[in-house]
Amino acid sequence: MTQPQITVGILSGKEIEFSFPVKFSSSVGTEISGTQKVIYQDGKIHWQGKEYNELSFTPQQGAPAFFELKDVTIGINFHWERKEVQKFKGELKIIIEGEQLTAINVISIEEYLTSVISSEMSATASLELLKAHAVISRSWLLEKNKELRMKNEEFKRTLQKDSAANSSFFIPNSSFIKWYDHEAHRNFDVCADDHCQRYQGITRASTPQAIEAVSATRGEVLMYKGAICDARFSKCCGGAFEEFQNCWENVKHPYLIRQRDSKTEKQLPDLNIEAEADKWIRTSPVAFCNTQDKKILSQVLNNYDQETADFYRWKVSYSQQELSELIHQRSGIDFGQIIDLIPVERGTSGRLVRLKIIGTLRTLIIGKELEIRRTLSTSHLYSSAFVVDKEYEEKGHKEDKIPSRFILTGAGWGHGVGLCQIGAAVMGEQGYKYEEILSHYYPGSTLEKQYQ
């Protein structure tokens, strides 16, 4: 197997503005540089007074070149969402998708990975952490592409809308259970945001360590019994690993299992039990990811990620009005005033898999973890590992058993499946090798080189 090229969808819109600091060759046979703008109109790409179905711009051979894209959104639907100008190596393609244009970056997988590990965390992170992240990002990409490319032709035939895959079932007046996963994009391999893997080209500097990490692990992927691992990862597990089936489809992966994020403290309470989960979440158990070390955190988190100060244990407070309006807005269901939020099922990390919302107008069980997080936040609640306390006003509400305030005390940041980025950063600082980090978070997996 030779090193693959990858196509990355960066942004979409009616108009896309980009620039070339040095000369690029266009697919229509011209050499161009400087600022350019393409516009979607009447089913065509309009550029320099002419119409096209597709355009591509390639750096000239031997020239160190990059292009810039304006108004790229990062952190889509997260609390730190913003737009910025981004820089990319490789080829730029402009295509038509629906009634808008999409900008696609064509780049080698190893160059892509250098950016991904720099975009997912600071490129100044420890070398062993960056090596581990290079392996899991490469594994995720190759495992997904093998599966998704087989589906791609079917998607093109059915013209299914380009979106995150999800499955759900709804039992009227009883339950709404939904999970979200990655699905094939019709016209490119992956997108550039957290839906796939966070990719920002060369916007943020790739340090010699990031380059070394990708080079040292070139072609390496995680394997389990002859298949590439589905190498999931999140920011902070909260001290315990979640299992795959509690977040996505009901399939168990033997390398994504219940375990404590520690080498010294092996015993993990049964967090499926409500009393044990309550105690776990309200305390601060020993774990690799239980750290406030600013040096380590600055290596793992980019500036906008550091806007989240509390991630191992956190609190969110809502007034009755705030919560009832939020749930109504996010779910599209009017529950009336919220009487209670009751855990129905927890996973192996204490994360809620199913949550019962009791209102004055109706009651409904929702899940899985991301649906719960989306329902209880304007973007994404840090995790679904939380317990609920209620406050009552002295007069009025208490007699009606209507809480005046809900306080959520939670653990971790993200789904908690697979590698814990904060925990892995601590392991790297403590001298663990990348192979040891990977075997800790993906027990039973092995390393294998797919290409030279």
Locations of regions flagged by a protein language model:
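Conserved, single-site charged/polar hotspot
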Residues: M1-Q452
